Amino acid sequence: MVSRAKVGAETTKGIDEPDRNDNTDDNGAGAVEVTEAAEDAVELTNDISTQLPQHGFLARFYTGLSRLYTGTGVFEVVGRRRLWYSVGGVIVAVAVLSIIVRGFTFGIDFKGGTTVSMPVSPGVGGTGAIEVAQVADVFKKTLGSDPESVVVVGNGASATVRISSKTLSNDQTSKLRNALFDAFGPKGADAKPSKQAISDAAVSETWGGQITKKVVIALVVFLVLVGLYITVRYERYMAISALTTMCFDLTVTAGVYSLVGFEVTPATVIGLLTILGFSLYDTVIVFDKVEENTHGFQHTTRRTFAEQANLAINQTFMRSINTSLISVLPVLALMVVAVWLLGVGTLKDLALVQLVGIIVGTYSSIFFATPLLVTLRERTELVRTHTRRVVKRRTLGSQVGKKNADSHVAAGTRKPQNQAESCADASSQEGTEVATASVPTVLSKLAPGVRPVRPTGTRRPTGKRNNVGRR
């Protein structure tokens, strides 16, 4: 019995020791590399699993949307920045071309002129739909030229017709007022027809120029302060990227006004400052996350600077979208109130420029600001050196991982042969009878009638000592 246990223990020891030696030799050379490579492999597996088709487009869309909401999305922005640069370049080119070719439709505040207003006549329906065409016809018959614009301002009993034209002399203004009174008979506050219900005002073009000059000064001061703040708070590359993004927003918004033909008023110019503030806020949100992710990035080789920046975009993607949607709601409400309820042109102009600016600012903060920051930072020696280290470490880790996988496969194919050879050696040393009893000890399946070998060590598996000599 003792010889059988002894042979079983020696046989087990002979079989187990080569495996331990192989593992020690394989892992001792690159333990750190294998550990980091394993972490990257797990992360890469998670990323790839999210990109595999999962029961149709809707399932993949829902999975991607849920990952964006949790900040773990894999939406590639920085890696495709050349595509976004191309899209942005086309948009800017169209905007600049429209500004050069079409120009702007300036309001009366910028080019000067005369405005004539009168209440909407109830006899024509009170809606102003027919009133506009009739007023334009009366204007042309009276003065021999078409008005620049005829619009209905307000709604209901407070609705008025506003006529805008080039600067008129006093005689022309008086003649037009008489013609409008004869054609429509507007009523005054006492509900009786009165010429006093028709009002006129001359607007000097210098007033619009003064407003524009003040807005330009405010814009320059705003950009300087923003550049100084971002440089002190973050870094100069973020300041350059943020200022370039705001110039992009201004150019595209101005191009939209020129292309569509929206009227440019002082409210429009003032609204540009509002959209710059919104664009800056949205950009700083992403930059703050980029700074958090890239803090001390040069001390690790897990991700490159570009990958950390792309992760920051994914983590703030839905926050930017939700912020934009929440900002659009009051702007749309302002447009509804301005157009359909009050008819106040100033509110409409202000809401319109804000709506266009919010859409453009959201796009630029996600697809332009951060990719431009990465492009600027990748020109520095620090980021280039760190990127080379990450690529080198990943290459080394993949090679070590492949070597370990090959060694484990080879060990798995040789193990049954080693067990048989060990059993043969044991049988030659102790005899056929002892060898026959020792083989079942190594293998997991015992032969019928053979008792299992009791462990001969001085410690139990639980760590307690055996009472040596006690039966």
From Swiss-Prot:
<dbReference type="InterPro" id="IPR022646">
    <property type="entry name" value="SecD/SecF_CS"/>
</dbReference>
<feature type="region of interest" description="Disordered">
    <location>
        <begin position="1"/>
        <end position="29"/>
    </location>
</feature>
<keyword id="KW-0813">Transport</keyword>
<keyword id="KW-1003">Cell membrane</keyword>
<dbReference type="GO" id="GO:0043952">
    <property type="term" value="P:protein transport by the Sec complex"/>
</dbReference>
<keyword id="KW-0811">Translocation</keyword>
<dbReference type="Pfam" id="PF02355">
    <property type="entry name" value="SecD_SecF_C"/>
</dbReference>
<comment type="similarity">
    <text>Belongs to the SecD/SecF family. SecF subfamily.</text>
</comment>
<feature type="transmembrane region" description="Helical">
    <location>
        <begin position="211"/>
        <end position="231"/>
    </location>
</feature>
<feature type="transmembrane region" description="Helical">
    <location>
        <begin position="355"/>
        <end position="375"/>
    </location>
</feature>
<dbReference type="InterPro" id="IPR022813">
    <property type="entry name" value="SecD/SecF_arch_bac"/>
</dbReference>
<feature type="compositionally biased region" description="Basic residues">
    <location>
        <begin position="461"/>
        <end position="471"/>
    </location>
</feature>
<feature type="compositionally biased region" description="Low complexity">
    <location>
        <begin position="448"/>
        <end position="460"/>
    </location>
</feature>
<dbReference type="InterPro" id="IPR055344">
    <property type="entry name" value="SecD_SecF_C_bact"/>
</dbReference>
<feature type="transmembrane region" description="Helical">
    <location>
        <begin position="267"/>
        <end position="287"/>
    </location>
</feature>
<dbReference type="GO" id="GO:0015450">
    <property type="term" value="F:protein-transporting ATPase activity"/>
</dbReference>
<dbReference type="GO" id="GO:0065002">
    <property type="term" value="P:intracellular protein transmembrane transport"/>
</dbReference>
<feature type="transmembrane region" description="Helical">
    <location>
        <begin position="88"/>
        <end position="108"/>
    </location>
</feature>
<keyword id="KW-0653">Protein transport</keyword>
<feature type="transmembrane region" description="Helical">
    <location>
        <begin position="325"/>
        <end position="345"/>
    </location>
</feature>
<keyword id="KW-1133">Transmembrane helix</keyword>
<dbReference type="InterPro" id="IPR048634">
    <property type="entry name" value="SecD_SecF_C"/>
</dbReference>
<dbReference type="GO" id="GO:0006605">
    <property type="term" value="P:protein targeting"/>
</dbReference>
<dbReference type="InterPro" id="IPR022645">
    <property type="entry name" value="SecD/SecF_bac"/>
</dbReference>
<dbReference type="GO" id="GO:0005886">
    <property type="term" value="C:plasma membrane"/>
</dbReference>
<feature type="compositionally biased region" description="Polar residues">
    <location>
        <begin position="415"/>
        <end position="431"/>
    </location>
</feature>
<feature type="transmembrane region" description="Helical">
    <location>
        <begin position="242"/>
        <end position="262"/>
    </location>
</feature>
<keyword id="KW-0472">Membrane</keyword>
<dbReference type="InterPro" id="IPR005665">
    <property type="entry name" value="SecF_bac"/>
</dbReference>
<keyword id="KW-0812">Transmembrane</keyword>
<dbReference type="Pfam" id="PF07549">
    <property type="entry name" value="Sec_GG"/>
</dbReference>
<comment type="function">
    <text>Part of the Sec protein translocase complex. Interacts with the SecYEG preprotein conducting channel. SecDF uses the proton motive force (PMF) to complete protein translocation after the ATP-dependent function of SecA.</text>
</comment>
<comment type="subunit">
    <text>Forms a complex with SecD. Part of the essential Sec protein translocation apparatus which comprises SecA, SecYEG and auxiliary proteins SecDF. Other proteins may also be involved.</text>
</comment>
<protein>
    <recommendedName>
        <fullName>Protein translocase subunit SecF</fullName>
    </recommendedName>
</protein>
<feature type="compositionally biased region" description="Basic and acidic residues">
    <location>
        <begin position="13"/>
        <end position="23"/>
    </location>
</feature>
<feature type="region of interest" description="Disordered">
    <location>
        <begin position="393"/>
        <end position="471"/>
    </location>
</feature>
